[in-house]
């Protein structure tokens, strides 16, 4: 559910971007709808609304959501202020690389890798497995950042599609791979769990 909520602003961004550019009159003022800049405005507005509602309901936002929101506001505002999509193209790479830095830093700061802090309440795994899993996420974030950067500046006509659906596809593939990897190790901890319940 959380992943779907996080995807809403990006989906609205995509819909507006794909809309044929046209002038729309709102309260006597004329605005252009469609294209990268109106889509960027929609991304900013929808992100503020979505995460604002989440904050009011939960009284907090996760750190990853704060990072996503701040990055959206910063890079989106720069895109509109300078009328240059270059800033927006850097958003996904920077966010992914910041996640990679955070996951890498958790090996040296704190008592557990970040992935264990996120999933540890649901899974019992050896420390070595948690370390490998965390490293896998670091590599994944680095790869996603590099892929987004490459596509954004190499395939101008394709980068928005990749930003929305390519990143989602890579994430789903990675999660499936993670599930397969974890399934090979969960049975190692199952007997211990059963004994403790007895």
Swiss-Prot record:
InterPro entries: YciB
Major site of localization recorded for this protein: membrane
The keyword tRNA processing appears for this protein: no
Subcellular localization: Cell inner membrane
Gene Ontology cellular component list: plasma membrane
Pfam families: IspA
Residue stretches spanning the membrane: 36-56, 67-87, 90-110, 133-153, 162-182
Bilayer topology term: Multi-pass membrane protein
Keywords assigned: Cell inner membrane, Cell membrane, Membrane, Transmembrane, Transmembrane helix
Similarity comment text for this entry: Belongs to the YciB family.
Function (record text): Plays a role in cell envelope biogenesis, maintenance of cell envelope integrity and membrane homeostasis.
Protein name: Inner membrane-spanning protein YciB
Species per Swiss-Prot/TrEMBL record: Pseudomonas savastanoi pv. phaseolicola (strain 1448A / Race 6) (Pseudomonas syringae pv. phaseolicola (strain 1448A / Race 6))
């Amino acid at each position: 559910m959380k992943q779907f909520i996080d995807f809403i602003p990006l989906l609205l961004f995509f819909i507006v971007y794909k809309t044929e550019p046209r002038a729309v009159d709102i309260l006597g003022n004329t605005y252009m709808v469609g294209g990268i800049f109106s889509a960027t405005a929609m991304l900013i507005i929808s992100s503020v609304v979505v995460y604002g509602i989440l904050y009011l309901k939960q009284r907090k936002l996760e750190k990853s959501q704060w990072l996503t929101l701040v990055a959206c506001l910063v890079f989106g505002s720069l895109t509109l202020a300078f009328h240059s999509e270059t800033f927006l193209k850097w958003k996904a790479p920077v966010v992914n690389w910041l996640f990679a830095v955070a996951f890498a830093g958790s090996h040296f700061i704190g008592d557990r890798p970040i992935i264990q802090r996120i999933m540890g309440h649901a899974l019992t795994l050896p420390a070595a497995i948690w370390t490998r899993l965390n490293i896998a996420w670091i590599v994944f974030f680095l790869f996603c950042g590099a892929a987004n950067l490459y596509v954004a500046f190499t395939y101008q006509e394709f980068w928005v599609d990749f930003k929305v659906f390519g990143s989602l596809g890579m994430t789903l593939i990675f999660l499936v791979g993670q599930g397969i990897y974890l399934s090979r190790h969960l049975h190692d901890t199952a007997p211990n769990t059963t004994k403790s319940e007895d």
